[in-house]
């Protein structure tokens, strides 16, 4: 820009304190393929001793996190499965075919030789209690990740019911925010939870698979932008490629480019990638709603207009370029609501000629009344082809037809019980 006051060129810059996201592949490239590190405190304590300390702490509400981490590590060390094939992620050898691995094969483990912390022990506990005690302790992770009181209450009801199924006189787990709220800020406890979940995600029939009740929130943590894509595919019935064809806003497209950065194993269910945050592989997720606010908002606007409860309750994280993103979402939701993609799955024997006509392309009937009476716009596209719709909108200076706007306003009026600061609340407020 040229300033007429001082007759000089100035460079306009926007202040920002945003930290660039870190892709999981960068961790392994920069670390020469080394595994993430797990540090385990209280190295002098054996399993029977630390089990008694943990059970005593649970009974009295005096749990020591260092004891918990040591206990969960020792239990996980004894949980093994044989691999049917090589397990490799980002070039890291987690295990080879026919190898027995345990929960900690994902880490370089460092056992710390720190001073032993004492506590009140309970002697009425043995290895048979490990199945529910592990569940109870890992459930603190999930409780700590939930900010919703009602959600935590429901989790506790289910958790305590499960625990009582293993041991009738087991202590009740309570909603102690000070405890579970602080535990989830401890990086080693989060790595413990991630290790259990990554292992049980592969070995779903393991005796300890039920502990995922407490650890499942570790998988795809801070990946709401990426997960929104998968959810949108479910709601719309479109493939990811077909969804991308409907993106008419540059900011949304830029977010997709971020998400689709190659080499990050987002399509590998057994990769380190879903656990990159809790395992310390990334300092800032490139897949979060904060890193990709435009695609996240766009997809959940579409989902909400198509009556998805999950999208309705999705957080409203950004208002950047919201008008354009909203108009793009209006078009997509209108088309998906009014133009079905149906297939005749079964045919009577006498109707087989229909299949041949379809293959020959000789049955292309179209609805002649689709365009309506909107003379200013001309005929709206009769198909659900994104290119046709974009050309139509472009030719009309991207002013939405009344038919589209009226449909979306009607859908917005139907939204009820939307929580504050959510996509649903925003749409309900614009009518």
Swiss-Prot record:
Keywords: Capsid protein, Helical capsid protein, Host cytoplasm, Phosphoprotein, Ribonucleoprotein, RNA-binding, Viral nucleoprotein, Virion
Annotated Gene Ontology cellular component terms: helical viral capsid; host cell cytoplasm; ribonucleoprotein complex; viral nucleocapsid
Top-level taxonomic group: Viruses
Binding partners and assembly: Homomultimerizes to form the nucleocapsid. Binds to viral genomic RNA.
Amino acid composition bias (Acidic residues), ranges on this chain: 361-377
Keyword Ribonucleoprotein applies: yes
Pfam families in alphabetical order: Rhabdo_ncap
Entry GO MF terms: RNA binding
Summary of the function given for this chain in its UniProt record: Encapsidates the genome, protecting it from nucleases. If expressed without protein P it binds non-specifically RNA and therefore can bind it's own mRNA. Interaction with protein P abolishes any non-specific RNA binding, and prevents phosphorylation. The soluble N-P complex encapsidates specifically the genomic RNA, with protein N protecting the genome like a pearl necklace. The encapsidated genomic RNA is termed the nucleocapsid (NC) and serves as template for viral transcription and replication. Protein N binds protein P in the NC through a different interaction, and can be phosphorylated.
Protein name according to UniProt: Nucleoprotein
Gene coding for it: N
Naturally occurring in which organism (per UniProt): Bovine ephemeral fever virus (strain BB7721)
Family classification: Belongs to the ephemerovirus nucleocapsid protein family.
Subcellular location field: Virion; Host cytoplasm
Family matches, as InterPro entries: Rhabdo_ncapsid, Rhabdovirus_ncapsid_C, Rhabdovirus_ncapsid_N, Rhabdovirus_nucleoprotein-like
Disulfide bonds listed in the record: none
Annotated spans, Disordered: 352-379
